[in-house]
Design a protein with these regions (language model features):
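Phosphate/nucleotide-binding beta-alpha loop and adjacent structural elements of enzyme active sites
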Residues: 1-187
Length: 187
């Protein structure tokens, strides 16, 4: 297993889950190989991203304004997936990178040639400025020879100010994001 995590605050979680014999952790921000701003949110929020949180989108969902609060902004250097040294070929790729999936895929086409399956977190509603949505990712994945295999998780959220059972985390009907697996098109 190869894991990529540029946010040093999150590396410890990976190492708690996998031993060094099970996983090699690359301390890189995958993207397009250029310098970018990193919008750091609270570690537990899972919303740190290379894309700036979009206030009006966060306000649309209960509780997201707090989750998407940017604590600081840092300049960081990214690396293309195709350019990662000492990375062996892989047959499965899993990504949850807060909107950066499409750029990473586009900058990793050579690495994807032998990859049989890809698991991505895709958004139906852009929570970040210029964040590609599910439609953008799906069109691209099909263009490089992958087809949807299955949805693992479909996350719904309640629209503000609606709260169910007194808990803002209780799901509503608004589609938010999903984990989807793509496989190489067998036809």
């Amino acid at each position: 297993l190869s894991a990529f995590e540029g946010d040093e605050r999150q590396i410890e979680k990976i190492l708690e889950t996998y031993t060094p014999n099970q996983a090699k952790v690359f301390n890189h921000f995958l993207f397009d190989g250029e310098e970018h701003e990193l919008f750091l949110c609270k570690p537990a929020s899972g919303m740190t991203s290379l894309f700036k949180p979009k206030k009006e989108a966060l306000d649309f969902f209960n509780g997201f304004s707090k989750l998407g609060e940017v604590q600081s902004v840092e300049k960081i250097k990214t690396i293309r997936l195709d350019d990662v040294p000492k990375l062996r070929d892989f047959d499965f790729l899993k990504m949850d990178v807060q909107g950066a999936e499409l750029s990473i895929l586009k900058n990793g086409e050579n690495r994807l040639k032998n990859c049989l399956g890809v698991q991505l977190e895709v958004s139906y509603f852009s929570l970040y400025e210029n964040q590609p949505t599910f439609g953008d990712v799906d069109v691209y994945m099909r263009s490089i020879g992958y087809v949807p295999h299955q949805f693992l998780d479909v996350k719904r959220w309640s629209i503000a100010p609606t709260i169910f059972n007194g808990n803002f985390r209780t799901a509503g009907n608004q589609l938010l994001e999903s984990d989807i697996i793509y496989i190489k098109n067998p036809l």
